[in-house]
């Protein structure tokens, strides 16, 4: 979970609340030789190139593509963790990014204390966390362990606590990157149902996941990325079929999204 900065945000929520991306590009410098002191050793790597997308209020958009396609970079830009190198982004409402669960947790603090610490990092107020405390603890199913030091938790327990914090806070847009394999099968089902509740209540979700079954069950539309470019946006089933075709071919034409 990362704190999110808002880019051109409008907190007076409009009926047509959207995420609007126009010609978004993001580059990183790559070191091409071992000697880090020579400027010529750097070359630009474009993680995203001219990506334009709209996400409407209450829509669930799936971002799909092969490893290295640019999915995580795009989600980080939407959540405000990264700024684009080029292009324009408008995000209406409070966006929360659900990435590495439990970032900022302190092992010497109890689960209860970490709720307030992690919540503050995300940007929640102390009053909001107090009001949501019981809901967070109940959703996590940690029971008496909530008052034990986090250092005594298993990895699964830490992930459950991190997920429980984020899904019980107030937000308009939730950005989720590959973090739904939390806990056992029953808890994962519970997490999926909470996301379905968000969908039914009109929240906006942007999600990436390697499970195309989950993407098909949850998403209204998909956007297919490859080598940082948008190949397709539209119908979920059609997009997944194009993704599978991409996996099965060595070469794929990179052109404008349909």
Stretches with model-predicted labels:
Residues 227-228, 243:
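Conserved ABC ATPase "signature" C-loop
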Residues 13-49, 236-257:
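Pre-NBD coupling/linker segments of ABC/ABC-like ATPases
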Residues 209-210:
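H-loop/switch region of ABC-family ATPase nucleotide-binding domains
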